C-alpha cells in the first residue's frame, strides 16, 4: 500500500503552489510506474496501462471515471484497444500539485 492512496485531494485554486523540485523527486519515487512529461510547457504525470482487450480497457476507464468524480479531480484519458493512457496534472495551476500524485497512486490501486 502506498501512503498516497490514504490521502484525499484538496481543492486546488489558481494560486495553489506547484510541487517543488524536492517534492517532485520524493513523490515520483512513490509512483515508480509513472513518467513525467512536459506538454506545452506543462508538467504532467503519465502512465500507459495494458489490457487483453478493449472491453477490459473500457472497464478500467469507467472505474477511473468513478474515482475522478469521487475525488473531484479529473485526468486526461485515452482508451484504445488493449491500453489506456492516463495523464494527471492540475489544470488550474498548469502543472503538478500533490493531488496529481495522490490520484496517480489511486489509479494504480484500481488494478488490484
Curated annotation (Swiss-Prot):
HAMAP family given in the database record: Pterin_4_alpha (MF_00434)
A Pfam family recorded for this sequence: Pterin_4a
Entry similarity comment: Belongs to the pterin-4-alpha-carbinolamine dehydratase family.
EC number: 4.2.1.96
Record's keyword terms, sorted: Lyase
Record field: catalytic activity: (4aS,6R)-4a-hydroxy-L-erythro-5,6,7,8-tetrahydrobiopterin = (6R)-L-erythro-6,7-dihydrobiopterin + H2O
Transport recorded as keyword: no
GO terms classed as biological process: tetrahydrobiopterin biosynthetic process
Protein name as it appears in the record: Putative pterin-4-alpha-carbinolamine dehydratase
Enzyme class: lyase
Keyword Lyase: yes
Matches recorded under SUPFAM superfamilies: PCD-like
Molecular functions per Gene Ontology: 4-alpha-hydroxytetrahydrobiopterin dehydratase activity
Amino acid at each position: 500500500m502506498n501512503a498516497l492512496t490514504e490521502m484525499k485531494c484538496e481543492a486546488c485554486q489558481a494560486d495553489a503552489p506547484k510541487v517543488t523540485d524536492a517534492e517532485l523527486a520524493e513523490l515520483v519515487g512513490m509512483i515508480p510506474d509513472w513518467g513525467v512529461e512536459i506538454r506545452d510547457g506543462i508538467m504532467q504525470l503519465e502512465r500507459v496501462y495494458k489490457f487483453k482487450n478493449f472491453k477490459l480497457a473500457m472497464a478500467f476507464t469507467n472505474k477511473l471515471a468513478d474515482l475522478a468524480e469521487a475525488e473531484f479531480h479529473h485526468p486526461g484519458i485515452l482508451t484504445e484497444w488493449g491500453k489506456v493512457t492516463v495523464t494527471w496534472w492540475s489544470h488550474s495551476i498548469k502543472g503538478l500539485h500533490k493531488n496529481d500524485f495522490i490520484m496517480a497512486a489511486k489509479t494504480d490501486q484500481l488494478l488490484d
